[in-house]
Curated annotation (Swiss-Prot):
Subunit description: Binds ribosomal protein uS19.
Keyword Signal among record annotations: no
GO biological process: ribosomal small subunit biogenesis; rRNA processing
Entry protein name: Ribosome maturation factor RimM
Keyword match Zinc: no
HAMAP family: Ribosome_mat_RimM
Keywords: Chaperone, Cytoplasm, Ribosome biogenesis, rRNA processing
Family in the record: Belongs to the RimM family.
InterPro entries: PRC_barrel-like_sf, PRC_RimM, RimM, RimM_N, RimM_N_sf, Transl_B-barrel_sf
Known role: An accessory protein needed during the final step in the assembly of 30S ribosomal subunit, possibly for assembly of the head region. Essential for efficient processing of 16S rRNA. May be needed both before and after RbfA during the maturation of 16S rRNA. It has affinity for free ribosomal 30S subunits but not for 70S ribosomes.
Amino acid sequence: MPSGPISVARQVCVARIGAPHGVRGAMRLWSFTADPLAVGDYGPLSTKDGTRSFEIATARAAKDHLVVTLKGVTTRDEAVRLNGLELYVPRDALPPTEDDEYYHADLIGLPAITTSGEPLGRVLAIHNFGAGDIIEIAPASGPTLLLPFTNAVVPTVDLAAGQVIIELPAEIEGDTPNHPEA
């Protein structure tokens, strides 16, 4: 199991290790890449803090995950200790995106501006709880905003200018709906 410091700047999470599979060090792996089997093509996979790195020795598809072996991991006990570990690669190791596609890492930290030009906050995270992407905005004060990451709510992502434009929905943060029964 190779280890050594790796730069943590601009790291992108590409996989998460799951439970062991068998007794010879194989494990389940959930890949977050477009082609799950390509997860090892981006170079060594490292921990978030960059102190440990791993190379995929073998990988095969299985239902909704992969079954992989990592170089240097040869026993079930070693695989158990890695369960739940998220694996990262440098952002520049990933292929370029298509128009209207973004890596979450490229959006985190960008200023969020309303369509009227008012500062709203910064992009804190992108979530997906199963019904579509959610953009989390951290305003300068007050609670964070969770908004649907749709073209209607996020009409513009301008990576060159380093900002996202947000069209706030009419009913948000306790606004009273424009209905007579309200």
